[in-house]
């Protein structure tokens, strides 16, 4: 059976505003065989009860910490020397990149047949039932495609 793996990331603010809705909707509507991993930063999981999702800290990833340190001045203001520009902010979406690549590396190390890896933004909602066959039926576009749920 093909394994389906979803990955997302969030911090405390994103979780309290939108992320908890995603987690609840996954628990309610998704087949349990769909694996969901959430990487977190600036978030204390001990303050929450989160079931059905594998939580992993981004700050345990050495490359992530090194990236943040090496690029701390590239925060969209070039260390407060210019007005904020989102396209100069090297940190803004880095958590997404590291969450997705870390999960991909983890799956590749576990098995040559790791299955699918699908990113889901934390501000998404799972409003309908989702099972493995629903996803596999979308494969008509080939091995790589964008999935909007």
What residue spans do the PLM features occupy?
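Short, solvent-exposed helix-helix connector turns and helix-capping sites enriched
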Residues: 85-87, 128
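GT-A fold catalytic core of metal-dependent nucleotide-sugar glycosyltransferases
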Residues: 92-148
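N-terminal anchoring/stem segment of glycosyltransferases
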Residues: 1-84, 91, 105-113
């Amino acid at each position: 059976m093909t394994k389906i793996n979803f990955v997302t990331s969030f911090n405390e603010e994103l979780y309290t505003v939108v992320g908890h809705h995603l987690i609840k909707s996954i628990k309610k509507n998704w087949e349990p065989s769909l694996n969901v991993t959430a990487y977190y930063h600036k978030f204390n999981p001990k303050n929450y009860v989160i079931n059905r999702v594998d939580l992993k800290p981004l700050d345990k990833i050495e490359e992530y910490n090194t990236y943040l340190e090496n690029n701390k001045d590239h925060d969209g203001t070039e260390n407060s020397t210019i007005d904020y520009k989102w396209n100069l902010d090297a940190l803004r979406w880095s958590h997404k990149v590291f969450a997705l690549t870390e999960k991909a590396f983890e799956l590749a190390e576990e098995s040559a047949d790791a299955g699918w890896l699908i990113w889901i933004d934390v501000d998404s909602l799972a409003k309908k039932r989702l099972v493995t066959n629903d996803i596999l039926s979308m494969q008509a576009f080939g091995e790589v495609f964008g999935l909007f749920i």
